[in-house]
């Protein structure tokens, strides 16, 4: 099972139990966070697609750690003027572990639902 969800302007592809880094969230370590802007959920039988979001779709995750990302170096340089300016930036990140992806079929209200077994059968048999 996997899902695609959105935080701000970024989209993340996650599976249950996966650990990912997202932009800093102002919650304490050990708390749970719930993401409601779910774009797509795929379970064993169906794919649910939102327009743009799935109504009752949610992803629950544990906050593991707050840290800084990799350093990005910025250089400003003017030729023949002996001018150089160096700057660095480290983005604040939050490490989360996906605990649960809501796949309760009766609760999900989505734009489109595709039955995977039927779709694959149609492609194989040429219907």
Swiss-Prot record:
- Organism's domain of life? Bacteria
Function recorded in the entry: This protein binds to 23S rRNA in the presence of protein L20.
Q: What is this protein called?
A: Large ribosomal subunit protein bL21
What gene does the UniProt entry assign to this protein? rplU
NCBIfam families cross-referenced by the UniProt entry: L21
One GO biological process from the UniProt record? translation
| Sequence similarity | Belongs to the bacterial ribosomal protein bL21 family.
Self-association and partners: Part of the 50S ribosomal subunit. Contacts protein L20.
Q: Pfam families of this UniProt entry?
A: Ribosomal_L21p
Molecular function via GO: rRNA binding; structural constituent of ribosome
UniProt keyword Ribonucleoprotein present: yes
| Keywords, alphabetical | Ribonucleoprotein, Ribosomal protein, RNA-binding, rRNA-binding
- Note the InterPro entries from the entry: bL21-like (IPR028909), bL21-like_sf (IPR036164), Ribosomal_bL21 (IPR001787), Ribosomal_bL21_CS (IPR018258)
């Amino acid at each position: 099972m996997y899902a695609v969800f959105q935080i701000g302007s970024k989209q993340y592809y996650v599976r249950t139990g996966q650990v990912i880094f997202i932009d800093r969230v102002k919650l304490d370590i050990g708390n749970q966070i719930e993401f409601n802007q779910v774009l797509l959920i795929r379970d064993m039988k169906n794919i649910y697609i939102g327009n743009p979001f799935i109504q009752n779709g949610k992803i629950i995750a544990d906050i593991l750690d707050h840290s800084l990302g990799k350093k990005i170096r910025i250089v400003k340089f003017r030729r023949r003027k002996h001018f150089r300016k160096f700057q660095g930036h480290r983005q604040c990140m939050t490490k989360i572990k996906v605990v649960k992806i809501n796949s309760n079929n009766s609760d999900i209200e989505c734009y489109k639902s595709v039955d995977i077994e039927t779709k694959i059968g149609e492609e194989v048999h040429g219907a």
